[in-house]
Amino acid sequence: MTTELRRKLVIVGDGACGKTCLLIVFSKGTFPEVYVPTVFENYVADVEVDGRHIELALWDTAGQEDYDRLRPLSYPDSHVVLICFSVDAPESLDNVQEKWISEVLHFCSNLPILLVGCKVDLRNDPKTIEELSKTSQKPITFEEGQVVAQKIGAYKYLECSAKLNEGVNEVFETAARASMLKFKPASVPKTKKKKHCILL
């Protein structure tokens, strides 16, 4: 009989980008219709990956700036980190590079990171497209998400819709698989020291 593995997953990203809905749909199977900002919340869910049973402790966090000093308390003893953004909010993808990746690398430097595009059901939503066009913006494309994932050295880029329950299980199966790896951040962006060549 195989022993059950326990893994801790932390999810971060801008406020209202879809983190909590993603966790609730995966762990409870229901989509919460009312938005209530999270401070800290924990869920537990089981996942079967490659014949192994894994208990995932899911740590939800607040994306709002008010909680920037509290959020780091969620990071210790984690095995994998999800950085989320919403495809209907281009600034949430900008913040992946401008805020979230530096915070995650500071507190979880050797962990696998998954970049997750949430709310993909809104990508082709006429109302969303119209609203974004007022500020000369468009919903984030799959390719744009993938480019950012490569830039931040993510283990993988995935997309999902918690509302339609599409791609949700794949996100957590991939995260569980990543959490079992001995991870070395080979492609994490680092500031390179300039080397000077001296010609003799």
Swiss-Prot record:
GTP binds at residues 13-20, 60-64, 118-121. Keywords: Cell membrane, GTP-binding, Lipoprotein, Membrane, Methylation, Nucleotide-binding, Prenylation. One of its GO terms (cellular component) is cell tip. Residues 198-200 form a propeptide. It is found in: Cell membrane. InterPro entries: P-loop_NTPase (IPR027417), Small_GTP-bd (IPR005225), Small_GTPase (IPR001806), Small_GTPase_Rho (IPR003578). Gene3D superfamilies: P-loop containing nucleotide triphosphate hydrolases (3.40.50.300). The modification Cysteine methyl ester is found at residue 197. GO terms for molecular function: GTP binding; GTPase activity; protein kinase binding. A motif (Effector region) lies at residues 35-43. It is a lipid-anchor. Coiled coil: none annotated. GO terms for biological process: actin filament organization; regulation of actin cytoskeleton organization; regulation of endocytosis; regulation of fungal-type cell wall biogenesis; signal transduction; small GTPase-mediated signal transduction. It comes from the Eukaryota. Its main location: membrane. A lipid is attached at residue 197 (S-geranylgeranyl cysteine). Belongs to the small GTPase superfamily. Rho family. This is GTP-binding protein rho5.
